[in-house]
């Protein structure tokens, strides 16, 4: 029996990701990116090619970021990203992603990026660069908005139960309750 997995934000570690997929015996039908900054999509082409997975992004992100801005960030980081991946699936707030018995709700959490999303389900939320352990995402890139970022966090993420595990795009995991009590940006 084949088990399916979901890859979220395959940054720049295609080999490590594909090794884990192989070791776990997973098939990957879908790659979801929380936002299209290069450090979250760098491995998409290689992982997509190796797994045959479809790529899913929020509709606002697909129109803004999957092209020029990703190339700009790539060149700033010393990388090469001449052929940005094109998504097969456009996501909207409230969509449900179902993979092998797992169900995640798409929460549109713009601010760090116009089409930024978080994925919530099974007592956890993957926040990309929206919410960190005692921090929030940057809002000084083109298309970012600090006001919108804080509003997204307060209305979409802080409404989740306190014991919800938060897995940010960078840094250690935390909980919604811990961030509600101690995040200085909120």
Model-derived regions, located:
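Secondary-structure boundary motif
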Residues: 1, 23, 49, 159-162
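Metallo-beta-lactamase
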Residues: 69-74, 96, 103-108, 113-186
């Amino acid at each position: 029996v084949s088990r399916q997995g979901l890859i979220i934000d395959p940054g720049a570690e295609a080999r490590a990701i594909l090794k884990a997929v192989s070791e776990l015996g997973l098939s990957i039908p879908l790659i979801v990116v929380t936002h299209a900054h290069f450090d979250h999509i760098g491995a998409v082409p290689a992982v997509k090619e190796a797994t045959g997975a479809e790529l899913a992004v929020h509709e606002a992100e697909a129109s803004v970021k999957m092209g020029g801005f990703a190339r700009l960030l790539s060149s700033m980081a010393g990388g090469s990203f001449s052929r940005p991946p094109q998504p097969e699936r456009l996501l909207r707030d409230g969509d449900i992603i179902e993979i092998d018995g797992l169900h995640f709700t798409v929460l549109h959490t713009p601010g760090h990026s116009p089409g930024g999303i978080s994925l919530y389900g099974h007592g956890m939320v993957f926040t990309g660069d929206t919410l960190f352990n005692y921090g929030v995402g940057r809002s000084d890139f083109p298309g970012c908005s600090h006001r919108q970022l804080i509003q997204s966090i307060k209305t979409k993420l802080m409404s989740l139960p306190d014991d919800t595990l938060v897995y940010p795009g960078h840094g250690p995991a935390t909980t919604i309750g811990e961030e509600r009590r101690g995040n200085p940006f909120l």
